[in-house]
Amino acid sequence: MVALSNALSRVFGSLAGYEFPSFIQKGINALYVKIFKIDLSEFEPLENYKSLNALFTRSLKKERPFDKAPNICIAPCDALITECAFLDNDSALQIKGMPYKAHELVGEINPLNPSFFYANFYLSPKDYHHYHAPCDLEILEARYFAGKLLPVNKPSLHKNNNLFVGNERVTLVAKDVQGNRLYFVAVGALNVGKMRFNFDKNIQTNAKARFTQTYSYNPPIKVKKGDNLGNFEMGSTIVLFIQNTAFKDLKEKSVKFGESIGEFHAN
């Protein structure tokens, strides 16, 4: 199953990256935009993308404004927040009724502190596929975990136990603006060609080699709130674990990168 889902995703990624003659590619792009009801008002027109992958990974034409105050946490991506809550004895939900252990997802030996709040950001095929820093960060490690590439949509989340933990993923281990530990987890999915990280091109995902690898940064990599951390090559999920933060009521709400979603408490 692992080999099949990953092989299918590699094949899809290769096809999505193929550049057809411009008149054919324009038609393919137009069909994709129509099927998934993609709003291109913030992006280049569909004829400007030389492949489906270029359309998937489109960049914003203009920077989005966001609150620069250091105590404000912003949405890292355009997404539907499917679950969010404080951890309960290290348990988080991938979807209602489907718990998993947070420490297993992020790659820690011990359970996470109950002060962690988590939020699942589901990026659908129509969404902007880049992910950004939710606050000023110092990235200490990037942990790559090999795994399956099962779909991360709601039917799949209801069907498959421990889906996030079993899927390929990259966990960014960081310090937030207050110096507290923060985890930013990019979860792979079926037909996601790759997950890319702008601060370290050495991080390889959806490769044939099936191994776990840790990339350590000393000194830490400093990024500013709103900085582009990377992108999926198709929609998937970001899981954010963050401490000492008062979040808004977010469950089942769609958010855009740059929207204020919470406020840090004083330590």
Swiss-Prot record:
* A GO molecular-function descriptor: phosphatidylserine decarboxylase activity
Posttranslational mods? Is synthesized initially as an inactive proenzyme. Formation of the active enzyme involves a self-maturation process in which the active site pyruvoyl group is generated from an internal serine residue via an autocatalytic post-translational modification. Two non-identical subunits are generated from the proenzyme in this reaction, and the pyruvate is formed at the N-terminus of the alpha chain, which is derived from the carboxyl end of the proenzyme.
Pfam family name, one? PS_Dcarbxylase
| Record InterPro entries | PS_Dcarbxylase, PSD-B, PSD_type1_pro
Which residues act catalytically here? Answer: 78, 132, 236
Specify the superkingdom. Bacteria
Site, as annotated: Cleavage (non-hydrolytic): 235-236
The UniProt record lists the EC number as 4.1.1.65
Q: Where in the cell is it found?
A: Cell membrane
Reactions accelerated catalytically: a 1,2-diacyl-sn-glycero-3-phospho-L-serine + H(+) = a 1,2-diacyl-sn-glycero-3-phosphoethanolamine + CO2
Q: Which UniProt keywords apply?
A: Cell membrane, Decarboxylase, Lipid biosynthesis, Lipid metabolism, Lyase, Membrane, Phospholipid biosynthesis, Phospholipid metabolism, Pyruvate, Zymogen
Required co-factor(s) are:
pyruvate
Free-text remark on how the cofactor is bound? Binds 1 pyruvoyl group covalently per subunit.
Biological process terms from the Gene Ontology for this record are: phosphatidylethanolamine biosynthetic process
Which family does the entry's similarity section mention? Belongs to the phosphatidylserine decarboxylase family. PSD-B subfamily. Prokaryotic type I sub-subfamily.
**Cited function:** Catalyzes the formation of phosphatidylethanolamine (PtdEtn) from phosphatidylserine (PtdSer).
Q: What is this protein called?
A: Phosphatidylserine decarboxylase proenzyme
State the organism of origin: Helicobacter pylori (strain HPAG1)
